[in-house]
Amino acid sequence: VLECLYSPIVDSVTPLGEGLLAIRECFLSKLIFQTYSGYVASQFKKMQTDIRNQGRVKWKHVMHLIRLLLSGTAVLTDGVMVVDVGCHRERLLTIKRGEMPFGEADAWRKELQVRFEYAFRMTRLPERPDYERVNAFLVDARRRALSEELP
């Protein structure tokens, strides 16, 4: 859901949507580390299961694991959710196509894991999301919906 708030592709935005986009940073906190760590662990487990059961990896799982580490590190470092993988796109596609040797992909994963953990230790994000501000937005949105102020 957070990725939707940071998507560079927006067709149209209502006034309510503009208000939500204006407070999107309120959703970011150090809890990103816990959330992304869970996603990374899940992808790593899938990768290990593939190796154990089939003797090979599903490259899509490897690519997603690395993409998650890149995204999580960017959020913790810059305080902004980066949806576009930009400069890493070709390298990620090389992994997805199975064209990168597993050892090289795994070395990148390990390097990114170290960076991710360092970014967590150094992040300036708050401990928790700004629940009060988000709740105030939600209450206002519901009030406006009930009074038919919304399109």
Residue ranges, per PLM feature:
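Metal-dependent nucleotidyltransferase catalytic core
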Residues: 1-3
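Conserved nucleotidyltransferase catalytic core and NTase-mimicking acidic/glycine-rich helix/loop elements
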Residues: 8-144
